[in-house]
Amino acid sequence: LPGFWKDADRQEYFHLYEVTAKAVKEVDERLLVGGPAICGVDDVSWLQDFLDYVKEKKLPLDFVSRHHYTSYVPDRVGHYGYIDLHDPDDAFSGLEKSREIVDSYEEFAGKDIHITEYNTSYIPNAPVHDTCYNAAYVAHMLSRLGDCHTSYSYWTFGDVFEELGVPFTPFHGGFGLVANGCIPKPTFWTFAFFKKLKEKKIHRSEDSLITKQKDGSYYGVIWNPDNDGKGEKKEVTYTIHLPENYERQEYCNLVKIVDEEHGNPLKVWHD
């Protein structure tokens, strides 16, 4: 907290919420207020203390907010921060704990939780952001974030980040889905693919999500991140089984791929 406000502490932050929430509601009761925007540092203690404060002071709380980043402390070398990511399943344990804490309060049980920022790394100069690995890892996140959260906002759409100014090079590990110059990075296509997943979910696993549309067509996303960091090639196979009574006619299986050779502008830039 002192990184944002001089001599700030937890109680001062809660007091800031108190005066802000009251001011907002005085203007219009219909405006929603919430917090505390925890961000992966001592989350349990922060969230419990915040809810205790709101309960004791009888403050308005329409929703709970938090951030979600899944990297360890970066190894800073030159302009960049190189990071390792948590195991995808382990990364969700903190989110599930937040839901559990909120629901443990009678006053707040069932409150909406909004993830107002999420990404792999929390720094705007992590090379992982520009990679296919990031795209595959985020696909796993997208497949599950909606289970316990009302909304979740990827941080950020573009690489021009106001805190650090205009990027010094097209690919510098920025947060964005698109690099400077509106170049779509691999993770951009993760969102483009997930946009197609509508109507009825018929399958979800640790590496895939399949939906059936009203017109009878199927859309799916399959991801294959190299979570062990060894860079070894891992094959992905899938099989489509048609029922015996399926109408005999022509069918089309359209596949779009993002990997080191496809949809990867970073490699083109390096080459």
Language model segments and positions:
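Alpha-helix capping/termination and helix-coil
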Residues: 102, 106, 149, 195-202, ...
